[in-house]
């Protein structure tokens, strides 16, 4: 029997990450979640903008990602919306990332949360912070693209 095609649907994006960082490597990590968190993710009750990834004792943790509990899904437990979540990667990937993060200027940032074959995954990136002038260049490029699109749209009318 043929394999089903891999399905991927986005839950949340960290749009500020692209503005604040240059990305060098991307990795897809699994997440250790509680049942109420999975239900909240299915409803899209997550905020990723304040999240960041740290390495402690050879393991990756997602900190600051806010998953707001559903009122009906978590009646018997007291959910913590900003609980630290463990990320799952292979040991050799973690070692390589640890070596690069120890260099000056590098950090790990979460890019998005998505479903891959029914499992919640977090895409993380090895990133280097942008300087203020780089951020200004990004804004100029974005505004330039908008103006070109507006001009093209008005031409076709």
Swiss-Prot record:
PROSITE patterns: SSRP. Keywords: Cytoplasm, RNA-binding. Belongs to the SmpB family. Its main location: cytoplasm. InterPro entries: SmpB, SsrA-bd_prot, SsrA-bd_prot_CS. One of its GO terms (cellular component) is cytosol. This is SsrA-binding protein. GO terms for biological process: trans-translation. Required for rescue of stalled ribosomes mediated by trans-translation. Binds to transfer-messenger RNA (tmRNA), required for stable association of tmRNA with ribosomes. tmRNA and SmpB together mimic tRNA shape, replacing the anticodon stem-loop with SmpB. tmRNA is encoded by the ssrA gene; the 2 termini fold to resemble tRNA(Ala) and it encodes a 'tag peptide', a short internal open reading frame. During trans-translation Ala-aminoacylated tmRNA acts like a tRNA, entering the A-site of stalled ribosomes, displacing the stalled mRNA.
